[in-house]
Amino acid sequence: MRVLKPFSRGTQITVGGVVGVALVAGMVYTSPSRPAVAAAWNSVTKSDATPWVGAWGAAVQPPVAGNEDSGQNWSTEGFRNQTVRQVVRVSAGGTRMRVRLSNVFGTRPLRVDGATVGRSAGGALVWPDSLQKVTFGGAAGTVIPPGREAVSDAVPLSTSPLERLTVNLRFTGATGPATFHRFALGSTYRADGDHLSDISADAFGASTDSWYFLSGIDVDSGQADRRTVVFLGDSLVDGVGTTPGADRRLPDGLAERLAVPRPARPFGVVNAGVGTGKLLRDSACGGQSGVGRFERDVLDRPGVRAVIVHLGANDIGAPQMDDPCVRPNPEVSAAELIDGHRRLIRAAHAHGIKAIGVTILPMKGALFPIWDPDAEKARQDVNRWMRTSGEYDAVLDADRVMADPADPQRPRPGYVFMDGLHPNDAGALAIAAALGLDDL
């Protein structure tokens, strides 16, 4: 049994029957016409063997106003008398699915008055006859306390690997500032009033490229074992530099490799990357540090078999930047970063999860000031430790994939985005191809 700390990082609330989870505190159910209230618990029992697979996920962040690098979003204003339509691509298929919602960074109870899910027909369109109601403890809606998360009942909607789904959430009252994921690389749509049952896009005239309250989709694989792979990382994992709407992030590349029928590896891939995220310290735009969110973003996912970690680049580069998004930004030594990685490895191994390290990418030549000789030395020291210590169960050497043969401190020209730092589509695909599937 793993005992959760008192809500400091957000506690998962499960509403309805969930395999492998036992409620310790009581759950309050109401009639289907009224929302179920997700009550707190203080401990859970988790089973290693579960049919649920994490098929999609997002690392949630505190609300923050948009800026020039991420565009505008609706997190600070929240929603009132609106329907929010979000389109995501699942990495694994199953006979049923369920939805995870988060109010981890909310300041008030989040009342979700209704939810539906269906197959995306492109943009805000939904395939006819595919919409299904999502319930919570048999009720049409739920109330999620601040600092908590909720998991829906199982929905009888079958899914296929790499299929796009549409999740619709209805908010009647004001939500307050929204727990969200800032850099979605995909569109979320908003309509005034109740449009949970609409298959057309007519009412959804406003859009943004962030996700709101939606933190995960699980599918029932029908096989009781561990089949979830989680990427924990920064903008490399989040997909900065790849084509918006094209699902070309590093985790997407792995999901596509795993979905190839021969040999099929029916694993789900969850993306827990956060642009500007750090390993050791929280930041204004990156939210919680990697060590601070490891429990929620990795351990609380169902059936996790491996975690793949790329963190530390922003810890190294932030001291050179005068950007409020990355503050606080004190200098961090390689020894401190290695200690942080060791904490993640220990936490993973304590739960029987493989830990795979990803070497930090080349940083020289970026359009923003993140590189100097001291930063390069710290990067090289961390990468050398990853390659030689044997402390990670395996290493994905993204540094060597991305390095320019003519100057290994810089990224390879054909693999880098126009900002001179982040992998483009080709670079992300090359890194995904370098991971040994037998290491998972």
Question: Predicted segments — roles?
Answer:
Residues H310-D315, L344-R379:
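Active-site segments of SGNH/GDSL-like serine hydrolases
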Residues R2-L232, T242-P244:
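N-terminal secretory targeting modules
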Residues V237, A255, A259-P263, L299-G303, ...:
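Sec-exported extracytoplasmic/periplasmic mature domains
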Residues G268, K354-I356, A394:
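Proline-centered loop/turn at the N-terminus of a beta-strand
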Residues W56, R80-Q86, P109, A115-G123, ...:
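Conserved SGNH/GDSL esterase-like catalytic core that processes O-acyl groups on lipids
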Residues Q288, E331-R342, E376-Q380, D425, ...:
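Non-membrane alpha-helical structural segments and their capping/turn regions in soluble enzymes
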Residues L361-L440:
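Catalytic His-Asp segment of secreted/periplasmic serine-dependent ester chemistry enzymes
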Residues S102, R170, L232-S235, N271-T276, ...:
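Active-site-proximal beta-strand/loop segments in catalytic clefts of secreted hydrolases
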